[in-house]
Design a protein with these regions (language model features):
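A short SAM/SAH-binding and catalytic strip from SAM-dependent methyltransferases
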Residues: 114-127
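N-terminal accessory regions of S-adenosyl-L-methionine
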Residues: 1, 93, 155-157
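A short glycine-rich, Lys/Arg-flanked "PGG" loop and its adjoining helix->strand segment in the class I
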Residues: 128-140
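Conserved class I S-adenosyl-L-methionine
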Residues: 1-45, 59, 63, 83, 141-157
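Class I SAM-dependent methyltransferase SAM/SAH-binding core
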Residues: 49-53, 57-104
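A short acidic, Gly/Pro-enriched loop at the edge of an enzyme's catalytic core
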Residues: 103-114
Length: 157
């Protein structure tokens, strides 16, 4: 594991529980509706297989699974995955969560219809590499729309 990855892992391991409390509160307020509407606008129609990269406490994964999508959330931090599973269980939502490095995905091509992420790129040593995730998904609408939105988070790349 590279030094930066270790620092990110240590940072989020210490903060996982408190961050989980914040996201639990957020899932029950009007901000969730706004995020849900924005995701609906950006994602193709229909029930999708969605990969949530850097799922953290599972916020996006839970929002999307509640809409009937099949969601897999991945995160580098086992403590965050624990928080994500707890949130999904608490809300009786079915989603799959795995510990995995966002820059070394272990899924065959076309495993997903869409890939989402929130607040991930700032933690990555090479954020542009996540844009190479497109082969893991097959998109039916403009596959660049979400990438453009992500690039706004790291314009220097």
């Amino acid at each position: 594991m590279e030094e930066m990855e270790k620092r990110v892992l240590d940072y989020w391991t210490v903060r996982a529980h408190d961050f989980g409390v914040v996201r639990r509160n957020e899932i029950h307020n009007k901000l969730s509706k706004r995020w849900s509407d924005e995701l609906d606008r950006l994602l193709p129609e229909g029930k999708l297989r969605i990969l949530d990269v850097g799922t953290g406490t599972g916020y996006f994964a839970v929002l999307l699974a509640a809409k009937g999508h099949t969601v897999t959330g991945i995160d580098l931090t086992p403590a965050m995955i624990g928080e994500a599973k707890a949130l999904a269980d608490e809300l009786d939502i079915s989603a799959r969560f795995e510990v995995m490095d966002a820059q070394s995905l272990n899924f065959p091509d076309e495993s997903f219809d869409a890939v989402v992420t929130r607040n991930l790129t700032w933690t990555l040593p090479e954020p542009v590499r996540i844009f190479g995730m497109a082969p893991r998904s097959r998109t039916r609408r403009d596959p660049h729309k979400l990438r453009r939105k992500l690039r706004q988070q790291c314009p220097q790349q």
